[in-house]
Regions:
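Short aromatic/hydrophobic "clamp" motif used to bind/position activated sugar donors
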Residues: 111, 349-351, 355
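Glycine-rich, basic loop-to-helix element that forms the pyrophosphate-binding segment
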Residues: 88-106, 333-342
């Protein structure tokens, strides 16, 4: 196994290798215009507290705009002079659409999302927007602490008044940030630790990612779905633990509700169909969009294609395999996972230079799994006899490569995959289906 970097990097570039935001810990940017988008529905007291706290931010006031995005409250929210209000009709829980509406009205280079019931400390905005100002791909998530603010005056300094009334912080979230080094060690499943109540990113990257999915019309999940797409588009995830905002009341998981499990199940089922990565999607059902697409070279004969495709689907049962042999060979074309046409947007594409037989799936599965992390973008696959078999590349690396002419910020890894061998033009099909014979039967 060997590894090589792609491109040369210095700390004045607008990207970092992998997810290495820590390489910019020493840099403070020149302030840029920031738009704070406060999502609101029928919480006038909480909104007033949050807007008061935003007026006390230590970020340059002339570069800070505040937009309240109202999700159809019964009464029009009252906002102070200088705060812009945008509203949409009440058609259920549509926080995703409300946030997008706020973005449409925004003029800032950096977007900072808050919920109306989540009140920031005075240095919150400055700390949240540091990385997105330096790195257009940065997505930062602050620390959402919880307190009972019901008896706290609206104009009380939140940093002094909230700690005495603090409620339990979600342990799963706190522990995840600790394990990952504040998301420095992020991967394909780290979207679960990005919450829209305390979120910031550049306007440019938000637009490139497509914004929030407005089809979400019930509580929860729209921020995770966006964060998944953002990561796949090349986001650099960072938790900023000293950017603190206080949520009025307990975490959702800590509330007493007989419907909480049902709501959680609805969210998980919805996301399972939208996020086709291991640990998030169904374990056996075919995903709506494949996580892995394997592409065979053109002109592979039916026998070789059969052995190759069948062995690949043993290793990756939910992958899509692309081969022009599917047009002619009924035994291949009748499987919905096999196609003659390549897809246009999958998480990982494995391009084979030669047809292969996978006699031991585990080494190949481990090699492809490396692409779930942040640092490696391409894996070159070599057989035990030194034959170059092909290469796998992540969508994340491809998106960054297109974005930056100087490179994609990922490493390339060369892996010898034991148990995977090149297939000759007429492999012994009976040996394959019967499960007998070694690699020489298929060469």
């Amino acid at each position: 196994m060997s590894e090589s970097p792609t491109g040369v990097w210095n700390d004045r570039m607008p990207w970092v290798p992998g997810n290495r935001w820590d390489l910019l810990a020493h840099r403070e940017p020149e302030p840029v215009r920031v738009s704070v988008i406060v999502t609101h529905y029928d919480q006038p007291v909480e909104l007033a507290r949050t807007l008061f706290a935003l007026a006390l931010q230590d970020y340059p006031a002339g570069l800070l705009e505040v937009i309240v995005a109202d999700d159809g409250s019964p009464d029009e929210p009252v906002v102070p002079a200088g705060v812009r209000l945008v509203r949409q009709d009440d058609r259920g829980f549509r926080a995703a659409a409300a946030r997008n509406l706020g973005v449409e009205a925004a003029t800032g280079e950096v977007l900072c999302f808050l919920d109306a019931d989540t009140t920031p400390e005075p240095d919150y905005v400055r700390k949240m927007v540091r990385l997105p100002t330096l790195l257009p791909e940065a997505v930062t998530v602050g620390r959402r602490r919880h307190a009972d603010l019901s008896e706290v005056p609206l104009d009380a300094p939140i940093a002094e008044s909230a700690p005495a009334r603090e409620l339990d912080e979600p342990a799963w979230l706190r522990d995840a940030y600790a394990r990952s080094g504040n998301l420095l060690d992020a991967d394909d499943r780290s979207y679960r630790y990005v919450i829209s109540a305390v979120l910031a990113c550049s306007r440019r990257f938000f637009a490139e990612s497509g914004g929030f999915d407005e089809s979400f019309s019930s509580y929860g999940g729209e921020d995770w779905e966006w964060a998944h797409r953002a990561w796949q588009a090349g986001a650099v995830f960072a938790h900023v633990p000293d950017a603190v905002a206080w949520h009025d009341g307990p975490d959702w998981a800590g509330r007493e509700s007989g419907d909480r499990r049902r709501a959680g199940n609805e969210q998980t089922l919805r996301l399972a169909s939208l996020i086709p990565v291991d640990g998030s999607s169904a374990r056996g059902l075919l995903p709506t969009a494949p996580d892995l697409e394997v592409r065979l070279p053109a002109g592979v004969g039916t026998a070789a294609a059969f052995v190759c495709v069948d062995s690949l689907l043993v290793a990756f049962p939910r992958a899509r395999v692309v081969t022009d042999a599917a047009r002619e060979a009924e035994v291949l074309g009748q499987d919905p996972r096999v196609s003659a046409e390549a897809g246009d947007d999958v998480r990982v594409v494995l391009e084979l230079r030669v047809p292969v037989v996978v006699l031991d799936p585990e080494p190949l599965v481990r090699a492809i799994a490396v692409l779930s992390g942040a640092s490696v973008g391409t894996v070159e696959l070599v057989s035990p006899d030194g034959t170059t078999l092909g290469h796998a590349v992540s969508r994340r690396a491809l998106r960054r490569r297109r974005r930056w002419d100087m490179g994609d910020g990922h490493h390339s890894l060369t892996v010898t995959v034991d148990g995977v061998h090149a297939v000759g033009p007429e492999p012994h099909v009976e040996a394959w289906v019967g499960g007998w014979g070694g690699a020489d039967r298929f060469a």
